Amino acid sequence: MIYLKVQENEYPAYISGRLIDRDWDGRASKSITLTMTPAQAAQLFTDGLGWSIVQRETVPDGTDGGTETMQEWDNADYCVAGPITDHRDGTLTVKMGKYTQLEEALRQIGEALA
């Protein structure tokens, strides 16, 4: 099972990515589909959000329950909040993206001048 992890909270989710998102200035992006209200999503998914993808699986080990394994991938580089699409079935999709090269250069110039 795949989860979105924000701080210590995990949300079941489907997550896909694009190296070049032509619908969003050509930036790399991740689309996160989960069960949440639009108001909750707008509050949670903001610029600068640190988040990760968690995969949990139960691996057979000869016992009745098996052993749970967990892998986690940091996605803090995808920190630009994008559009929220309400599917009107209790789920929504949120886009989180990386800065474009131009945005990154402008950020660095701004930091150097500060």
Placement of each model-derived feature along the sequence:
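Intrinsically disordered, low-complexity boundary segments flanking structured domains
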Residues: 1, 18-22, 37-42, 79-81
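Short, intrinsically disordered N-terminal pre-domain segments
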Residues: 1-25
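Ordered hydrophobic segments in well-structured contexts
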Residues: 1-5, 31-35, 50-52
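Viral virion structural and adsorption modules
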Residues: 2-6, 55-114
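Residues that cap or initiate secondary-structure elements
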Residues: 10, 38-40, 100
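Generic recognition of long tandem-repeat/solenoid scaffolds
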Residues: 20-37, 86-97
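Extended Gly/Ser/Thr-rich low-complexity repeat segments
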Residues: 36-60
